[in-house]
């Protein structure tokens, strides 16, 4: 589905629901709002942890501020470095529980360090002048109030200001203090992009903070860290590790499109989020890989760098930024303005390819961009084409034509050599999609389903609806083609609302494991299975290939999924966004 079409569909859907009274402001999590569009159009952001405890560390607010100014801090430097990373926004984290709760802006609210110079305001203005946004980090947490043996919060000062006793070292007291700060910031910074929230506070929730933010600043965005909170615009996924390959960050995410999703990770992948005095190395392959794989799933890469007191980055991070600018410039056609392919936006199958190859695909209009991050052990690359007819393939960097063929459901690139060290990009020009039956002509019934998520929800052409098996296994999905027709394969996009590997006993994949396929002429007599097997626990579109048969009815019987019983929320759970019947494999467009 083209991105423009999706946007129109989402806006129309939101409008319809609002008129019918089914949606209260703000819109539900899975619906797009105009205020989100700039973030949807972006690929990356720059995360800045910078406060009083930035090395060498200060306990005096005025001494910290003087050191910043004396060091020559300039907001334009951060904006320039963000642009090198092709970032569209910056997230400033100075009011952080581990950085002394330092507010890098003037405030009339006592309670923690607040500077006289308006560093936040200067950054917002500098970013706006160059078309970037600034989002402000807000912490929920008082637990680090005395870190390092120094008390960072001033309960007496805040109590006097409020005219009552408030203990800022408690979660409730800190909730009041930070709540007041939200409103002061909203009043003073209309050009701010929104708030990046490091988890909820009960005081905020009981006082309807988020609803009030949207009412006062409807253009602000709200992001929550590691929690998919429906009222928020974005969920951010912090520093995920343990994937194979290690750069494939989306394997550890669990939020289905079109929800805005962000991956926040440290560019020096070891050490603190803030500058602790060292010039840590930056792993090019890991971080370029993270950037590319996130883009291949329409996930925003929020990359953290460790600014020193004067705002400058250590030399290894500056060097990486310079490298990233040149490197990404050369392939930006394959990233800017694209969506991840193999999901709701259409496209070929990403992920695990032949002979050890691994990568993702991005899509823009009729062009798809194959990003090979791990090359195959041979000179051939084979990718499931998902019915797209290919007319031309070129090396994006050189423009050289690539030899290719299509058949059996796959696009095969041959005679490949000269692989890039990080990401070899092939531009695949397509001539439409073929060989699948229109979902409008297929009736899909399920033997079990959760309320509101019946079988037809997975065959209605919309990724805003989905089938849910109500944790019932085995479960049958019966396709009725209306008449006896050729059946070559089944395709399906499972809902990407679980990780794709077992991150822990309680965080596992809710994808199809074992299945059987049956066919019938009357929908009653199914006979023996014509195919049985397992699907991999991988993200993106998946396929069940059959020896071509002619039948009116096809049954996909799912007998097991990957999540173990230790993951009670996902055990036996199956959700499918869309599934379809393929009549023929695609051939090259010539």
Regions found by a protein language model. Name each.
Residues 1-29:
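Secretory targeting and sorting signals
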Residues 30-299, 303-323, 327, 332, ...:
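Glycan-processing catalytic domains of CAZymes
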Residues 359-361, 398-409:
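Extracellular/luminal ectodomains and secreted, surface-exposed scaffolds of diverse proteins
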Residues 407-436, 552-554:
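C-terminal beta-strand-rich structural cap/linker in extracellular carbohydrate-active enzymes
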């Amino acid at each position: 589905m083209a991105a423009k079409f999706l946007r129109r569909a989402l806006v129309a859907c939101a409008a319809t629901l609002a008129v019918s009274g089914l949606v209260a402001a703000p819109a539900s999590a899975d619906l797009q709002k105009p205020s989100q569009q700039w973030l949807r159009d972006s690929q990356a952001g720059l995360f800045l942890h910078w406060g009083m405890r930035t090395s060498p560390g200060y306990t005096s607010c005025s001494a910290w501020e003087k050191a910043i100014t004396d060091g020559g801090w300039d907001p334009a430097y951060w904006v320039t470095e963000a642009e090198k990373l092709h970032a569209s926004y910056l997230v400033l984290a100075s009011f952080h529980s581990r950085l002394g709760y330092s507010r890098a802006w003037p405030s009339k609210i006592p309670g923690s360090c607040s500077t006289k110079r308006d560093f936040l305001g200067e950054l917002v203005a500098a970013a706006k002048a160059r078309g970037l946004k600034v989002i402000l980090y807000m912490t929920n947490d008082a637990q680090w109030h005395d870190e390092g043996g120094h008390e960072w919060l001033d309960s007496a000062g805040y109590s006097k200001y409020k005219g009552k006793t408030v203990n800022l070292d408690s979660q409730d007291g800190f909730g009041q203090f930070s709540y007041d700060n939200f409103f002061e910031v909203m009043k003073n910074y209309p050009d701010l992009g929104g708030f990046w929230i490091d988890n909820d506070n009960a005081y905020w929730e009981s006082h309807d903070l988020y609803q009030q933010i949207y009412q006062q600043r409807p253009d602000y965005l709200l992001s929550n860290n590691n929690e998919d909170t429906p009222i928020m615009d974005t969920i951010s996924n912090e520093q995920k590790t343990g994937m194979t390959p290690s750069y494939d960050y989306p394997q550890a995410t669990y939020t289905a499109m079109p929800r805005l999703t962000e991956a926040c990770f440290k560019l020096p992948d070891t050490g603190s989020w803030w500058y602790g005095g060292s010039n840590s190395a930056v792993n090019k392959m890991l971080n370029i890989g993270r950037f590319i794989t996130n883009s291949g799933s329409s996930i925003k890469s929020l990359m953290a760098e460790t600014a020193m007191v004067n705002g400058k980055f250590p030399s290894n991070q500056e060097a990486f930024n310079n490298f990233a600018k040149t490197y990404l410039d050369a392939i930006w056609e394959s990233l800017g303005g694209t969506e991840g392919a193999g999901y709701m936006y259409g496209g070929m199958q990403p992920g695990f390819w032949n002979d050890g190859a691994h990568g993702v695909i991005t899509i823009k209009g009729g062009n798809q961009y194959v990003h090979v991050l791990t090359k195959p052990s041979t000179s051939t690359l084979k990718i499931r084409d998902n019915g797209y007819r290919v007319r031309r393939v070129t090396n994006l960097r050189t423009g050289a034509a690539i030899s290719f063929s299509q058949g059996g459901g796959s696009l095969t690139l041959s005679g490949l050599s000269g692989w890039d060290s990080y990401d070899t990009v092939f531009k695949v020009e397509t001539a439409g999609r073929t060989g699948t039956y229109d979902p409008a002509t297929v009736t899909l019934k399920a033997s079990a389903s959760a309320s509101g998520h019946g079988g037809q929800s997975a065959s209605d052409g919309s990724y805003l609806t989905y089938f849910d098996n109500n944790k019932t296994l085995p479960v049958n999905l019966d396709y009725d083609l209306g008449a006896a027709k050729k059946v070559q394969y089944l395709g399906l996009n499972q809902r990407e609302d679980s990780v794709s590997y077992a991150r822990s006993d309680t965080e596992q994949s809710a994808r199809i494991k074992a299945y059987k396929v049956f066919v019938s002429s009357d929908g009653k007599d199914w006979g023996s299975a014509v195919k049985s097997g397992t699907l991999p626990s991988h993200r993106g579109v998946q396929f069940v290939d059959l020896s071509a048969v002619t039948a009116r009815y096809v049954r996909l019987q799912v007998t097991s999924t990957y999540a173990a019983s230790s993951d009670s929320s996902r055990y036996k759970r199956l959700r499918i966004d869309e599934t379809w019947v393929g009549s023929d494999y695609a051939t090259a467009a010539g």
